[in-house]
Amino acid sequence: MSTDRLQYVYAVTRPFDGVLPEGAHGIGGEPPRLLRHGDLVAVTGAVPAGDFDEAPLRARLEDLDWLADAARAHDAVISALSTVTCPLPLRLATVCRDDSGVRRLLEDGHDRFVRALERLDGRVEWGVKVYAEPGAAQQQEEEPAAHAREASGRDYLRRRLHARRSRDGDWQRADALCRRLHTELSRCAEAGTVHRPQDARLSGVPGVNVLNAAYLVDRARSQQFVELVDGASEPGVRVELTGPWAPYSFAGIAEEDVHETQEAGR
């Protein structure tokens, strides 16, 4: 690409009344704009070719700090858009050469975009994570060796056995709660998907993540969904609810489809 400015596409939506909320800013602080083509609207923003042309973008995507900033700006636009319409979020760094490229992207992906928007209309995404937390027994097992030596060998072994049984009980309770909760939430939701558990070493969140799921829920049933999550409780188990979000996990367009459509728009 040779132009200094490219068009970053945040999302696709249907035409809607009103405007984007004031103060909505995307990549580089650039306010997003709406580009209508037929029965679809692309939400775009100008970005520098020096960062988003194909070669520099590959390098930028290896920079975790830059990537995190871009993801936050991307999500800010989607969140603002969600207050006025139902958006179909596109993947991070979907870039076209110019407005003509954006129009080609809408044309080439038209049927997939329409199907996905029909599926998402009136629905939001909720995230649910379940963690098995180290209980007091496990902490007891990890007492300093000096303290362990103060007790007899029999007492020490008894304490370790009790800690192990307690820890196994935590895992069993967490597993049972995950199965029960996922079944109940799936009945309340239009769709659900289970993601790979988070690594505590990377997330910094205490406990072991045993369920990392997302659910597509009608707005009208969101209160019922939240109450189901709030009612889930077991000793040694923590349940975390996030949302409501724009339905990233249920965009309904495979990564390869988005990539092909993106390439057509360049």
UniProtKB/Swiss-Prot annotation:
Q: What is this protein called?
A: Gas vesicle protein L
What is expression of this protein induced or repressed by?
Gas vesicle production is induced by growth conditions that promote production of secondary metabolites tiancimycin A and B.
Its annotated compartments are: Gas vesicle
- What keywords were assigned to this record? Gas vesicle
Presence of the UniProt keyword Lyase in the record: no
Q: Which residues form the signal peptide?
A: none
Q: GO CC: one term?
A: gas vesicle
Q: Which organism is it from?
A: Streptomyces sp. (strain CB03234)
> What family does the database annotate?
Belongs to the gas vesicle GvpF/GvpL family.
Further facts: This strain probably produces some gas vesicles from the probable gvpO-gvpA-gvpF-gvpG-gvpJ-gvpL-gvpS-gvpK operon; it can be induced to produce more under certain growth conditions.
Q: Which GO terms describe its biological process?
A: gas vesicle organization
Instruction: Check the record and name the Pfam families matching this protein.
Output: GvpL_GvpF
Q: Which residues cross the membrane?
A: none
